[in-house]
Amino acid sequence: MSRGRTRAAPGNKVLLILDETTNQKLLAARDRSGRTKTNEVFIRLKDHLNRFPDFYNSSLVKEEAEGIDDI
């Protein structure tokens, strides 16, 4: 897999590989809500993106990078 290259995704599907702890938490949430695992992930991801629309604020990242001294 090459890093640093981006291209437009051909569709709107995503493959996730979860660690066992995260998977177990997701399964427990699915069981509590009565939704499918896919719908649970969709709702949680959508909620996160609505709550944190600019998680990586580009101006803050730039300021942090400028404040680092060369070693």
Curated annotation (Swiss-Prot):
Alphabetical UniProt keywords: Activator, Conjugation, Cytoplasm, DNA-binding, Plasmid, Transcription, Transcription regulation
InterPro entries per the UniProt record, alphabetical: TraY
Gene Ontology cellular component list: cytoplasm
Molecular function via GO: DNA binding
Primary location recorded for the protein, binned into one broad class: cytoplasm
Subcellular location: Cytoplasm
Pfam families in alphabetical order: TraY
Source organism, top-level taxon: Bacteria
NCBIfam families recorded: PRK13740.1-1
Family indicated by similarity: Belongs to the TraY family.
Subunit structure: Part of the relaxosome, a complex composed of plasmid encoded TraI, TraM, TraY and host-encoded IHF bound to the F plasmid origin of transfer (oriT). Interacts with TraM, probably through its C-terminus.
Summary of the function given for this chain in its UniProt record: Conjugative DNA transfer (CDT) is the unidirectional transfer of ssDNA plasmid from a donor to a recipient cell. It is the central mechanism by which antibiotic resistance and virulence factors are propagated in bacterial populations. Part of the relaxosome, which facilitates a site- and strand-specific cut in the origin of transfer by TraI, at the nic site. Relaxosome formation requires binding of IHF and TraY to the oriT region, which then facilitates binding of TraI. Also positively regulates tra gene expression.
The protein's name in its UniProt record: Relaxosome protein TraY
Species assigned in the record: Escherichia coli
Top-level taxonomy: Bacteria, Pseudomonadati, Pseudomonadota, Gammaproteobacteria, Enterobacterales
Gene encoding the protein: traY
